[in-house]
A protein has these predicted regions:
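Acidic/polar surface patches and capping/hinge elements
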Residues: 1-355
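Cellulosome-associated attachment modules in secreted, modular CAZymes
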Residues: 349-411
Length: 411
């Protein structure tokens, strides 16, 4: 929730369980109606379409963001992205919050690492405190338990139990004599519950060449889309560490760079056909994971845990909210350590927000004398940011003229 989306009582009217994303994103016929981000703010050009089969996309993001064994872990993943798309490409041109003077690369790396590490540590404390307190189950436990109970939709049908799985035609059904699983494994399964899903690691012998595929399995044998050696983390689900870490990191990157967008307006990660996936062979085509904004990557990380069967949606939203608060607070605290002098140069009240009203540097709603004094403190410097009103990376005469034109105006 961002303060703009209307609140809803029924989550199903807000979120499309089957297709993912908001219900409002889809047309009445079920096709996707969203257009993503219209224009790259760095190039001024429209983003090119990047259409990918959902079966490939779902599996790829589940593996890309899994961060399990032999990985940099969920917090470490965001350090990888920081290095890959911010620190290395912008070497020699780093400005804290995208404003002020250019900062030497090593200094910028150390200070950005401090801010991000602090946020990741605080998110871990919050997430695992909640996990320990609520001790909430994972999807694999819930689904298998409910499958053993039966179905909860129709009391007149076989195997009814109020704690069973709801029947969904084509997805969750009662096994009858004509069902392909009626005598699976030489055992009579008539009356049991079947689920149409990813069939799991039991159908994979050689991951490099085999695919489990999608089909009917006994619901009591349901698997999340993960490695058989690392299926579901052995600790409580609520709330999602991935969602908290990712939202906090995205908040940090926005403040660190002074922009909602990745440098250049697009970050991409290559995905090669039949090479990228580890759990099984795939994907079926070559494409790039793409994120225009930092929040795009954060949201994808959170979604990957739902589509991978590691978290239900209830684990996601509260974690994002905590990540939002932790990311901002940790960054502000880091600034008191790494840039106290620069904060004083900006009037002693911290850094100027990137979306400040032009000329209203102290954010009091009026372009006045105190703003003029703040501007004079930066005059002649090779800075970017709020004082650089002509976007020349130099605080000079043209910026002064703009300020004088705005002087006395209310914001």
């Amino acid at each position: 929730y961002d303060g703009e989306t209307p609140a809803v009582e029924d989550f199903a009217s807000f979120y499309d369980w089957e297709q993912g994303g908001l219900v409002s994103w889809h047309n009445p016929d079920g096709s996707f109606g969203g257009n993503g981000h219209q224009t790259n703010p760095y190039t001024g050009l429209p983003y090119e379409p990047n259409i990918v089969p959902r079966g490939d996309y779902g599996r790829v993001i589940a593996e890309f963001w899994a961060d399990g064994p032999d990985s940099e872990t969920p917090p470490g993943h965001w350090f990888t992205l920081l290095n890959e798309f911010i620190l290395v490409p912008n070497a020699g041109a780093h400005r804290w919050r995208g404003q002020g003077p250019i900062i030497e690369d090593q200094e910028f790396v150390v200070k950005s690492y401090l801010a991000l590490a602090g946020a990741m540590h605080d998110c871990a404390i919050s997430a695992w405190s909640n996990k320990g307190y609520y001790d909430y189950l994972r999807p694999v436990s819930a689904l298998r338990y409910m499958a053993e109970k039966g179905q909860s939709t129709d009391p007149t049908q076989p195997n009814y139990h109020p704690a069973g799985l709801p029947l969904v035609p084509g997805l969750i059904e009662i096994i009858d004599d004509a069902h392909p699983l009626s005598d699976f494994g030489g055992v009579d399964h008539v009356g049991d519950i079947a689920i149409h899903t990813w069939k799991g690691p039991d159908y994979i012998e050689i991951p490099q060449i085999d695919q489990s595929g999608v089909g009917w399995i006994l619901a009591e044998n349901w698997w999340p889309y993960q490695r058989p050696s690392f299926v579901t983390p052995p600790f409580a689900g609520y709330f999602s560490g991935h969602s908290a870490f990712s939202r906090a990191a995205a908040e940090q990157f926005e403040m660190l760079t002074g922009s909602a967008y990745w440098p250049g307006g697009l970050a991409e990660w290559p995905v090669n056909m039949n090479q990228f996936l580890v759990f099984e062979d795939g994907p079926s085509m070559t494409f790039n994971l793409q994120w225009a904004t930092f929040m795009d990557a954060s949201n994808e990380s959170a979604l990957s845990r739902i589509w991978g069967g590691i978290h239900p949606p209830v684990d996601d939203a509260p974690a994002r909210y905590v990540g939002m608060m932790v990311g901002k607070n940790a960054f502000h605290f880091a600034e008191t350590i790494v840039f106290p002098e620069l904060a004083m140069e900006f009037g002693g009240t911290g850094f100027i927000a990137s979306d400040v009203c032009v000329g209203d540097f102290n954010a009091d709603g009026l372009v006045g004398s105190s703003d003029f004094l703040l501007f004079l403190s930066a005059y002649g410097l090779g800075w970017a940011g709020a004082y650089d009103m002509d976007d020349s990376s130099q605080i000079g005469a043209s910026d002064l003229l703009i300020l004088l034109q705005k002087f006395g105006q209310n914001c």
